Amino acid sequence: MLSRRSFTTTLAAAAATSLVPRLLRAAGVTPARNVVLVHGLFADGSCWSDVIARLQPAGLNVTSVQNPLTTLDDAVAEAQRVLDRQDGPTVLAGHSFSGMIVTEAGVHPKVSTLVYVAARAPDAGEDYTALAKNYPTPPASAGIVFDGDEGRLTEAAFLRDFAGDVPEAKAKVLYAEQEPFHKALLTGKTMHAAWRSKLSFYAVSTEDRTINPDLERFMAKRMGATTIELKSSHVSLISHPQEIADLILQAAGQRR
């Protein structure tokens, strides 16, 4: 398995130039038959189910990572283990917090393209919390509660601020399935920024109450991502699974 420190400074230096996104776009998408999906906070791997159901008929080999939500190192290591098992070019997609994992683990040599779904996309070594403070605080933040070192979202905040455009009955099921996260997870910083060397795609949720939509737009623009905007809550992968599947198919070289 690749360690977080095993990548050369040559890659980092080459990726630092703002020309990289344009050069990657000119080179085109590398066809991929593998897709690895990573979930964020207040969820588990099943949150991708409706997207998976649209990717598999296209012949894609899809794996949804069960993110441990303990520390960033643990989460990245789990994603890397799944990436190690892929048999060729792979699209790595993440929702919400797992954009941190995509950004870090995305330097894995089997990853061909990156997809961010209303996701964090920090630069290498960047303090995401400090970056987010440049934008109004999203309402969901007030709904996080802790039992000791474990955090979760209250039901009211989940239904209103996380999954506001999902039918209430389904949103309540998703609320019951959310995986608690450990406080230590929030202290991690990415050491690499895969989007500086990999072709990237981004789905902005314009009605997001968990990550500020303008912050999403900033991160998408900074990485030079192919970007779509969806009139969606934070969980566009659930409320707009076809659009998210289409974006992943585009990243896999099966759509234009």
Question: Residue locations for each model-derived region?
Answer:
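Flexible "cap/lid" loop of the alpha/beta hydrolase fold
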Residues: 111, 115-148
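Post-His helix in hydrolase/transferase enzymes
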Residues: 238-250
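Active-site loop/oxyanion-hole signature of alpha/beta-hydrolase fold enzymes
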Residues: 57, 61-91, 105-108, 128-133
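N-terminal export signals
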Residues: 6-26
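Conserved HGGG/HGGXW glycine-rich cap/lid loop of the alpha/beta-hydrolase fold
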Residues: 33-72
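Gly/Ala-rich beta-loop-alpha elbow adjacent to hydrolase catalytic centers
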Residues: 94, 98, 102
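Conserved serine/cysteine hydrolase catalytic core
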Residues: 182-223, 229-232, 237
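C-terminal segment of N-terminal export signals and the immediately downstream linker at the start
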Residues: 1, 21-38
